[in-house]
Every structure is written in structure tokens, then in C-alpha cells.
């Protein structure tokens, strides 16, 4: 059993009661909601005559269904308009802050909460969204929940949970130039599999993690769920504090000093006992690209699609399915695979540093003929910051479209979708069949810099080969 870990400390601080069957009633410090998984929860709440227990601990935004080209109301899609209108009514009725379009604070829920200083070390964070693990980058314990659990948190500000095991993933050395946190987490999922983390929290640690920016740590924790982990986290350190200082909702003055002292104490003890520990050499990781239909089917850009003989027998059936669906041949080099669409954005990679990395590749180059390439900032704040630095013009000059914030082509819940058998180079988090809107569309996951490299060449390319 793990002992002395950050996970243990945060768990113990938020325990309300031990329940029959071995679960624990856990206080939720921050509840994030959006337009997709909250409507049914509010209906269920009102059917029972209940009110939102802690509206001050509940924060809303709109992200999944918003168009990224024309955000004028009413939306062209009547269902999207109804979903947003419903969220607006529910938030108004229950006194919940809604960061709506044009507020200067709207964006993808897992982008705006950190930039507003809402996510802080030692918190428990819940949201009706799979990628809530993003917030673990701050030393929080954060997890996605279903609609019925959204109802429970609205009603009680608590949740019945089973305690997880804690696996520490230690990364020696440093990532090489042209290799990013996205490559690191795709490498982990490739190495361990998409189910390895079931029943676990992942603690990411080691010299390579210490060197990551907060935005890269968010990318890392965002995709812990794709490796089966319920949550992933990084111990809070000076990098965390430097990011948080001065943001709204964060303590200031003397309270700031007290907060940072307490936050430091939450880090896993030097003698912490983990249920499991695995080590990786960050220096050996290459830019990574998925070739199949799960995030675990990834390879280095300088590798070939694996043959069935190279795979574990248990992985061969899904590989055979992936070969057929993706129209890829075992042994085929992933570099050189042509793409149709290039998407930079999502809660995984829609932050300012992501856009800077992609813009560095796009600057002075042109999107290849026949390629549709577009950039969707993760929030209104990201968009305005990028525009202030001229990144939007860099992308436009290169032939990319510059869009308004939203989840966009990460998922098929808004107008940004693949068509037919199009294949996309995408900085998002899932490459499942149909994920990007077309039942036969294909997705190659990679870092924003790699997406930009694919956009200007027209095919999967090693960003390191393009130089400055």
C-alpha cells in the first residue's frame, strides 16, 4: 500500500466518512461543469427538490459544442444553442459563475481553470469530462466523473470513491530538442498499454518531469487517463508556484507565503512507499506518432508500423483491425504517410506554449497544397495572448486558419469534423474510430510541432529534420 505520497495526503485531507463496501465519501474542492454532462444532472437535482450545495466551489464554461468560426448567437446548430441556453439558465438559477463566450475567460474547461488560478495544489477536482486528470499537474487529485456523479457533487459537494493504488513513473535524464511532453506520454502509453493504469493514480517524477513547464505537465497529466489511470499528478514545486502567483483566485500577500509553505508539504515524502515504480529514460524518447486506433498504438517517427510478430499475442487482434482501418501496412514507415487535415488545439495541446512550438515550425513556411490546417486556441486568454505576440499572423501567413476557442476537432460535437476517409495529424488525445466526426475518418496523434511539420510537408515528418 502506498504511504506518504501526495495522493495519500490529499485523500486523507478530504475524507468525510468511510462507507459500507470499502468506499470513502470524499469532499470535492472544485467542481467544473460544462454544457454536455451537466443538463441531466441539474434535472435530476431538481426532480429531488435539491439545490446546489456549494455554488461557490462550482465553475462553468462552454467548450464542447461551440463553433470555432462563427460564435454569434444563436448558433446555427439548434441543439448546440439549446445546450448552451440550458447551461446559462442552470447557472443563473443556482448562482454558478459561467465563463461564457466573450467574457474573456471562456475556453476549454481544462485550460481555463488553471489559467484563472482555480486549480491549486492539494485540491480534489471533479468534472464530467474524461480529461480532468489534467489538473493533477498542480499536485491536485483530479478525475473525470459521469453525469450521475455530477448530480451527486452538485447536491453534496462530495463523492463516493474507492482509493486507488499509486504507481510512480520516474523519468531520468532530459527530453531531447524537438521532443515534448506529448511524446513522453504517448511513449508511456505505448510502453505500458491502455489498461495498465486501471485502479491506479500515476505520479510523474524525476529530472525530466522537474524540467517541464506547467503547460507541458498539464499535457502529461491530461493523457494519464488514456493509459488507464484514473488520475495522474506531479508534485508541486517552484515551477508550480511561479505559474500560479498573481492569478485570480490565488492567495496573495502573507496568505501566498503560507499557501506555498503548505503546498510544498504536500509533495510525496522522500521515503514514500509506492505500490509500484517504473523507470524511463527520457533521453531515448523520439517524436511519437500513433499509427492505429488507440493511443497505445504509437511509434517513434523514425520507426515502422509494427508487424504482428513484433506484438504481444494479446495485442494482435486490435492491431489487425487497425491495419485495415488505417490503410497501413505492417513494416511501413510512419514518416511519409500523407495527411489531409492538420489540427492544432484541444485540452491536451491548446495552450500558449503549444502554439509557440507550432508557430516556430510554421514561420517562413507554407501549408502544403491540398492540406487543410487550422489552429484553435484553448481559451480566449490563450487566443488574445497569442495574438499579442503575433502568432496568429505567423499561422495565417503560412496558410493556417486561425479560429476561436473551443474543443473543435478533438471530438465530433461541433462543426469541425473530418469528412469521409480523411486522415488528420492532430494534437488532441484520442484516435478512436469516428472520434473526429467521420465514421471512417482516421487520426494520427502527435505534438503540435509535429502537426505543424505535417502541415507544411503534407505528410508525417520528423520535426527535427526541419531545423529552425
UniProtKB/Swiss-Prot annotation:
Q: Name one GO biological process term.
A: L-leucine biosynthetic process
| EC supergroup of this enzyme | lyase
Q: Which UniProt keywords apply?
A: 4Fe-4S, Amino-acid biosynthesis, Branched-chain amino acid biosynthesis, Iron, Iron-sulfur, Leucine biosynthesis, Lyase, Metal-binding
UniProt pathway: Amino-acid biosynthesis; L-leucine biosynthesis; L-leucine from 3-methyl-2-oxobutanoate: step 2/4
Cofactor descriptive note: Binds 1 [4Fe-4S] cluster per subunit.
Q: Which domain of life is it from?
A: Bacteria
Annotated [4Fe-4S] cluster binding sites: 347, 407, 410
Q: What is the recorded function of this protein according to its Swiss-Prot or TrEMBL entry?
A: Catalyzes the isomerization between 2-isopropylmalate and 3-isopropylmalate, via the formation of 2-isopropylmaleate.
What is the protein named?
3-isopropylmalate dehydratase large subunit
Q: Which organism is it from?
A: Synechococcus sp. (strain CC9311)
